[in-house]
Amino acid sequence: MSDSLRIIFAGTPDFAARHLDALLTSGHNIVGVFTQPDRPAGRGKKLMPSPVKVLAEEKGLPVFQPVSLRPQENQHLVADLHADVMVVVAYGLILPKAVLDMPRLGCINVHGSLLPRWRGAAPIQRSLWAGDAETGVTIMQMDVGLDTGDMLYKLACPITAEDTSGSLYNKLAELGPQGLITTLKQLADGTATPEAQNEALVTHAEKLSKEEARIDWSLSAAQLERCIRAFNPWPMSWLEIDGQPVKVWQASVIEDATQSLPGTILAATKQGIQVATGKGILNLLSLQPAGKKAMSAQDLLNSRREWFIPGNRLA
């Protein structure tokens, strides 16, 4: 292709690998791949390569795994590749200004939200958590700030009432490569039109924690149901019963008003375990006790009915 670009790709997880895969068939020249160092994983804590490294090595691409890009010798790794552009997708390392300025067309990033909404670490989860009607991907020109650069291209997708972070992740992993390939074409032929982010519309997608995922019964049933979908597959919403954590995979909202204190078990039937919240009733449908597989409320009641006596309160 005549407008082929020399591209450095920087990314680490599966989400990034899907973008690298799309680039490999786009006609551009991938001159190097940067990814995080191998990390211990699994029960044996064996060093495991990132999904991006696995794909890059499979395709015979040069792979670089610096712990940081701050040292000058590591910055030379980037400079020596003489790239037109660096594509960054969920890389996990900060790019110093010296690196951002090295490629002729700078560095571009695929971000999992419609910027300036949800800058930061957990945009997919926060869009669900907040009850947003849509999300998408933004391809942006990187600068030294956190997701503050000019926007080059956006693609939106609706958020459904069934979406979890897992399903939304897959949708955006399809959209991202489309937006990336389009943006690279525009950069190559000089038609890209950068648009500054409106600072008045900025929201921040804070990292998730296991403690935040603990169910707080004082919240509304609607908010809790969104949390359950937002925190799936990680860190998973959970509650504590008899000193052990029980994950909640699925729930529904019953809008009925209740005078019972938040956390009070109102009913436990094959239709679900109904619990009073700060507003409305949360109907627990699928749960997972520690060391067990996820199961329906009915199956859990068959073995642990004493956990869910109506009138008792969950912590």
From Swiss-Prot:
Positions of region (C-terminal domain): 210-315
Give the GO molecular function terms.
methionyl-tRNA formyltransferase activity
The UniProt catalytic activity note for this protein reads: L-methionyl-tRNA(fMet) + (6R)-10-formyltetrahydrofolate = N-formyl-L-methionyl-tRNA(fMet) + (6S)-5,6,7,8-tetrahydrofolate + H(+)
Q: Identify which top EC class this enzyme belongs to.
A: transferase
Keywords recorded for this protein, A-Z: Protein biosynthesis, Transferase
Q: Which family does it belong to?
A: Belongs to the Fmt family.
Comment on protein domains? Composed of an N- and a C-terminal domain. The N-terminal domain carries the tetrahydrofolate (THF)-binding site and the C-terminal domain is presumably involved in positioning the Met-tRNA substrate for the formylation reaction.
| Purpose | Attaches a formyl group to the free amino group of methionyl-tRNA(fMet). The formyl group appears to play a dual role in the initiator identity of N-formylmethionyl-tRNA by promoting its recognition by IF2 and preventing the misappropriation of this tRNA by the elongation apparatus.
| Identification of the protein by name | Methionyl-tRNA formyltransferase
State which gene encodes it. Answer: fmt
